[in-house]
């Protein structure tokens, strides 16, 4: 028998049409592998059968299989909650955000295919090997085929089981001696119940921020530090992370102090602060993917030490520390160079000085700034709280389709669903990035983060290219979100000169509350919803006389009130017809007059 | 504990952020404790006014505008590099003054000067009495103002759940200088009276 149990591989029979409880496995007994992973496949259930139910052939008999059983229950418990109705099983995944993505039932049916799978398991494959060979089944097969529960894939379930297993296995806090494990199923079941109550884990949501107000290209290095922070944490705690965006992490762990000390040290070395909301509960109580929903949740804010008073001068970038460096004098002094800059001097603290001193990888943006080109900033933001609420509503709708008597409380969102979503969201970001590269070309695109882009632009017309691109991708990946007036994925586009201080753009983008925001620096803002992206694009294709819009745009520069009077003035019939035409397209979106004028400026370009 | 609410109106207002984008001077989109308390102290010759302010978010008010001007060195008579200044026009906001000895006998309407570029005509504000606020029941929400941490009890801020820290300038009396004191900025998650929170 091999030495290692690969937890992810525990649900082997779900790749086939065989019963999960081995009741029709007898004819393949000769092909059963002799590995520890296979022992996990057989022994990861511990269920005392109810009357009339077929029993599982085995139960956990050692520490490894017992931990696998707990991990499997913890991972599946997130999506496998009881429902009081029966119906036809569905073995393919139903994506709540993308129901039109129909998966085929690709499970292995033929005896020879199943024998091939068993032979593959006999070679003691890794999880990577399994994914390489059977990924098509893993992503299409629902983890749970019961009606209304087929919302997560087997792949997601396997990944989560692996994560939980390793955290339990290497924990110094969760104790399980071999002597505690008895040989009968009843005692094994009792032990499961006891450990699920006894073992308490922490669920935490961390949000990273920075105090810097970046205004030069090199100040954007702080965004690299943000990226490095999340990636360092990911490397250090690969099994603990359940969800991650560019500045947020949802994770679980057993020892708060040890984990927080490490994260604090990473954040501090990257000049970031963070807030953490966490709760410690027994395994059996942790179900929702939000620590705030658990009893006893607490919030901590991990800032670097802040003095009560700072004597002038204060740092001009972060405004959080005494300035003891002068830019660029002190920077040049490091290289024994005399100052050659024609720009003014700035008082910076040590941290901001170090960030600015780092060479910037944004070389194209630097060139565009020197040439004073126009740029488009594009930020894609995922609102986690909105995401959980949206998924809950979509799940409720789905349950009701299967069973009109389903209750709202049945539609609980579990980690597996969030993890399932994360995989599609990451694929979506990658696709957006690739398509931006195709549409604008490498020379005009700077990828600042995986959800923040800077594009050299020739004019406002590129904003429409971006809108078309979003419309297309939202339709492919998350069509259900397009029906919402306030969805969890937010697009922020800002047009400005490359020289325009980034912190002004960042302030707008990071505080974005609507799901589609278009900022034309110095010219106005459009706030609307992705739901109306079609209408917005349709409105651009209307036939309007340019002169009518030119008049309105020019008047608005003097007085927006006067422009509004002109907009509603029927005395100039020809202009009024154009305005009415535009109103018909834009007013249903709830756009105010300021938004309409901004839109006119967009069209004027 | 009670507060007096005044409405604030101005044609144009520039309350500068300390950071500057080289030749760009941004402005704050709120009225910090330091600015409004200082303006009231100057107006009425006192030193113990405690007040904060917020700007209305209705789209017709507080429009962002830009002014380009070239400051001139009076000694040499030479103009410096032109600066682009961000300012607010058609300003409308509300000011909440803590009721204490300093706030006794405030007029129904008065004029104060707030922010920078006063010599260019910015910052002339009209304060008009609106109402007295006695309901200061705290609730959880997102803070909409900037005030020094030491003044949190004055404004009945009971708990700071998720702070956004920053520093506000505090002048040293009878000098032309001052210090920066640790403060709570807009965006903090707090338990505070409703009028201090975002709607």
Per-region residue spans from a language model:
Chain A
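Regulatory and interdomain segments flanking nucleotide-handling catalytic cores
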Residues: 1-605
